[in-house]
């Protein structure tokens, strides 16, 4: 399953009305420069902060309101971009997948690399004028009713603590800690293995390594396609990017524990 989409393809489809481009970098960098027709979506928009501090996926009503406001429905292809050193774009892609969007992709290179390659970028004031012109276009020019996103939750790509407890000693399950070695050895879910999310990004602005490189890395760690994979990190952000890396490499049974260590720590089952 190809998670990424080619930058050259996007550059040639920037004005396509059936594509929604999402900038995951935050509003300040967005205002400075962004890809033409992109819309900003901060990480906080796709997170529900639980009482214990866990960063959980937003519920269906929230997702429907949010994604509809961005012009997303099931007929639109969604392309999310960000920076390779920031896993936020991965969490947004995973959130859309969890809520059942059928066609969401991660831009294959970072925004910095997009600029470096000479692809077009715009400033906020130019983009605002473009949006104004579109809003003033007559109905007969293709402007119809506003998009309506309908959540169709896919529970197979999400795990919670109770589910993990039933899988900790299952030889057919691999639990991946996508954090740093320091974090892993300080406190981790018993039985989990370390696979830092940064090991799955490229060295030249690629959001995800080549499939060949991913396969080699995963197999060396015993992360094989015949296993069910559960990813976690601190608050489920880096784990979401690791999920995309696994899907890109052709792994079918992959889940994200979005509660991650913040949620697990409340259950007093950590190895320290």
Where are the predicted features?
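Cysteine-dependent PTP/DSP-like catalytic domain, specifically the C-terminal lobe
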Residues: 256-272
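Thiolate-centered catalytic microenvironments shared by cysteine-dependent enzyme domains
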Residues: 51-159, 238-260
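Helix-loop module immediately N-terminal to the HCX5R catalytic loop
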Residues: 48-77, 198-229
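Short, acidic/turn-prone active-site loops that include or flank metal/cofactor-
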Residues: 43-48, 110-111, 197-203, 258-262
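Short cysteine clusters
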Residues: 233
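Flexible, polar/low-complexity N-terminal or interdomain linker segments that lie immediately upstream
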Residues: 1-32, 86, 108-186, 197
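Terminal peptide-recognition signature
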Residues: 10, 38, 96, 114, ...
